[in-house]
């Protein structure tokens, strides 16, 4: 049974049926993962600083809680009339006001794509047609402009991607899970066979992210 992800129930309940038009001025959500090998925060910092000072766009910056404290402090110091540094616990709260997201390889970008709004990524580890992925800093501003124009082919890819990873958009995933549990118990279900530890997979993932804390 396909249930969906309960975490997204409230999120889907708040989404409008139609994608709202781009705001004036547009609102850009910038988010970066904490892994030093995957994060583009330091690389794109000068561009975020420069673009936030032009006044053409509004920026909301939020960084992973485990991000290097010095990097967090640098971005927080950028706050001005056009840039807000947000420390909300749940990044989903920022999605509705944003017209697009800029990121790198953060898991949050897949969730943002479920709003059917564009994402610009820098050196994404798994780029695809649903993203505008760049590898040069000088392409950052042009990529944002392209995303804000919402080209039809990109928007179609975003919609296809969203339908593939979470086709159920009614905000009732938790209800389906509870129904599935009740049905499983009613049919005399027993605990499934324990999954293997997958220690090698976990080791490779931690090594790739250079993350060894428990």
Where in the sequence are the language-model features?
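A short acidic, often aromatic-flanked loop/helix-cap motif at beta-alpha or helix-coil junctions
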Residues: 6-11, 91-94, 139-143
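C-terminal amphipathic helix plus adjacent low-complexity
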Residues: 142, 148-214
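Conserved catalytic-core segment of nucleotide-activated headgroup transferases in glycan assembly
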Residues: 2-74, 134, 169-175
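Short, conserved active-site loop motifs that form the nucleotide-linked donor/cofactor pocket
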Residues: 57, 81-84, 131-132
